[in-house]
Amino acid sequence: MKTAVVFYALAICLTATVATGQQVTGKLGSADATTTINGKQLPPPPPTFGGVIKESYKDSTPWWPPRVVPPKGAPSILLIMTDDQGYGVPGTFGGVIPTPNLDRIAKAGLRYIQFHSTSLCSPTRAAIITGRNHHSVGYGVIGELSAGYPGYDSIISMDNAAIGEILKENGYATSWFGKDHNTPGFQYSTTAGPFEQWPTGMGFQYFYGFLGGETDQWTPYLFRDTTQVYPWIGHPGYNLTTDMADDAIRYLRDLNASAPDKPFFVYYVPGGSHSPHQPKQEWIDKFKGKFDMGWEKLREQIFANQKSLGVIPRTRC
């Protein structure tokens, strides 16, 4: 399931135009000048220096290129992708797991019922962050099985830029929380790099998550950007799913405090529904006995719910 949420839009005042036709706010050449771009070429070509350079400082005029900002009305986006979760799991799509916040979002927005993916983690994720067929971006297999053949090398080239890179170049704050199954196994080094195929190398300015298909929820293989971290040390009861949510909230709070008008793109990818299944005790207690009717009865209930919601075709059978 993939969910996008618009939080706010950025408003800017357009007051000037540079030679390329880009719109500029503020005094052109000053350090606080900003500009929008058309996005047809990324990164955009550097503007021509507009100052004056003479033999002495007093006869020279400094000039800064305008900082790129998104266009007026650019939305903030939260994209949530859960792992190994069937279409009929959340209540939003007829499941028996209560998902009141997702229900609220779906009621206020759009609910897609024809969203197809591959049957593997890495290929699906490569497609969603690039908007391209997974073979065309190197992910015919999962990252751990990377092979030295076109379509299977687990390398997303720069000419197939990820959405993090595209939005960053257009002035967004970009971040990735949770599972990263789009870094090939041969780039798992934690000190020497290379890091081109890590989230930070694909345009995501901040990364807090783990590499590979799965990780322990209590002692995860966890990174902040490209540095391994161990937040569970000295914190009994630590849980990655909770920590990840807290870190995302902190990130957005800090971003809003420092740049309240800057739109963000947050790629939020929890791994808690993938093995190893390690929910906190409070969730085990909450759902104890809820599925004692068995799979067949549960399937019939979900099927009826989905037909009632209209998220599956109403057949005569």
Per-region residue spans from a language model:
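N-terminal module-boundary/linker segments of secreted carbohydrate-active enzymes
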Residues: 25-31, 50
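Boundary at the C-terminal end of the N-terminal hydrophobic targeting segment
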Residues: 18-22
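Positively charged n-region of N-terminal signal peptides that target proteins for export
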Residues: 1-5
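Bacterial N-terminal signal peptides
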Residues: 6-16
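Formylglycine-dependent sulfatase
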Residues: 35-317
